[in-house]
Amino acid sequence: MEGVDCSMALADAAAGSPRDLSLVPERLQRREQERQIEVERRKQKRQDQEVEEEKSGFFAAAFARERAAVEELLRGEASAERLEEAANRLQGLRKLLNDSVLFLAAYDLRQGQAALAQLQAVLTERRQELQPKKRFAFKARKKDAAGTAQVDAAPVTSAAPSPPVTKEEEGAPGASWACGFSNLESQDLEKRAEELHQRDVLLSDLTNCTVKLCGNPNTLRLAKARGCKVLCGPVTTSVFLEDCRDCVLAVACQQLRVHTTKDTRVFLQVTSRAIVEDCSGIQFAPYTWSYPGIDKDFQDSGLDRSKNNWDQVDDFNWLARNVASPNWSILPEEERDIQWD
């Protein structure tokens, strides 16, 4: 009621002479100004929310339409032409999602990324179905010294455990990771193009390791790394960092998300805006790593080499628009001279 009385008093004074307005206590004038500012702020907030809802509605309709088209292509009889069209439309879906990151709610973003991962998995499966199967043939039996027949021994499996199956991470492709390294210390590790092409890579629980990934993976996840240097060729979709410390990462990708990571330098080429959350001491610089065959890997990845938003970063823990986030910064030029080899 006091705010209403204040407004009525100011209105009465304004209807009279300037002298009447000067008689209104300064405290009431200031309170009325604050009330008007708050009213304007709420009005602007409602307008912004309406715009965001309109954008989200457009995204949801466009995404659902294109997703249905890709699913229809993948359900039909498999052919190289249909799968190529499905791959192209799936790439368009990825671009739509990446271009909408700024206004999408976190839940909607995760749902979109999960849908993309599922479609990519089905596309990969259908492509494998088109590949010619190897013919089965019996091996000749060997005879021992006594002349008795012996059946070939069963193939020996590797004693090294396969990479662990992880629960589905935000935006990460679902069930399992195709290749990677885990639980190693002070090692120089490398995978080549034929091992990486369009596969999902997991690097986890590494300490003081140097990892070179010379090829075109589909996704890359780096988790629980300490003091590592990770150099990666162009990644077709997303790169995820989680719980890393004192690392150096060089990567080109469509989207980068960094969680719970500290004191890490990222040499980046990215076509969307990078995202950091619950991080500190993250430094960004342009992607400068190179290796023989990188041009072909960029071509296979579908990334636009002329587009690089390496210094466009959104911090989900820093909402002040006009104040720079203290959790990330640009790596000074004099500190970018890295000896990759």
UniProtKB/Swiss-Prot annotation:
GO annotation terms (biological process): post-chaperonin tubulin folding pathway
Phosphoserine: modified positions: 79
InterPro entries: C-CAP_CF_C-like, CAP/MinC_C, CARP_motif, TBCC, TBCC_N, TBCC_N_sf, Tubulin-bd_cofactor_C_dom
Keywords: Acetylation, Chaperone, Cytoplasm, Phosphoprotein
Subcellular location: Cytoplasm
Entry's Gene Ontology cellular component terms: cytoplasm; photoreceptor connecting cilium
Function in brief: Tubulin-folding protein; involved in the final step of the tubulin folding pathway.
Subunit composition and interactions: Supercomplex made of cofactors A to E. Cofactors A and D function by capturing and stabilizing tubulin in a quasi-native conformation. Cofactor E binds to the cofactor D-tubulin complex; interaction with cofactor C then causes the release of tubulin polypeptides that are committed to the native state.
Protein name in UniProt: Tubulin-specific chaperone C
Organism: Mus musculus
Gene name tied to this protein: Tbcc
